[in-house]
Amino acid sequence: MGGHGKEWQSCKDFNAVQDIAAARVVFGCGVAVVQLPCNGVVSEFRISRVELEYYMRGKSKLSDYLLDVSFAFMEQREKKKDWSKPLWDVTAVAWLLDEKFMEDRYEHSPVFEYDNCYGVDLRRHFIKYVYHINRDILFEDMFAKLAK
């Protein structure tokens, strides 16, 4: 992951803001990169407490454990019982597992500027840019795997 969707006014996400210089190296060195933008793309892979409870409770010991830990964390953080949360890290693994989970395209590698905006240089190498998460398909697969 890294940065936000290109339509956002900045690329200032949790990971990129930690070290813009590192993001510039990773995106500028020419290695194969898959960008899963946070806000505007991966943020769409959001689930609510109610959905998690409905689809996962009682399906397996692992799913019950994950729910208990996640619920305790979110209630401590959000200070309320009703919440929704993007499952950021699931999408990175999903991209590796099956192309049906998301849609991507080749784009020139963005330049992470120090003002937290993307720079554009059409001479740069291409990266894979994920622009859409197939939320329902990915959740269906995740729930089936966690129920085993």
Task: Tell where the protein language model's regions lie, with residue ranges.
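Class I SAM-dependent methyltransferase SAM-binding "motif I" and its flanking Rossmann-like core
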Residues: M1-C11
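Histidine/acidic residue-rich metal-binding segments in metalloenzymes
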Residues: G28
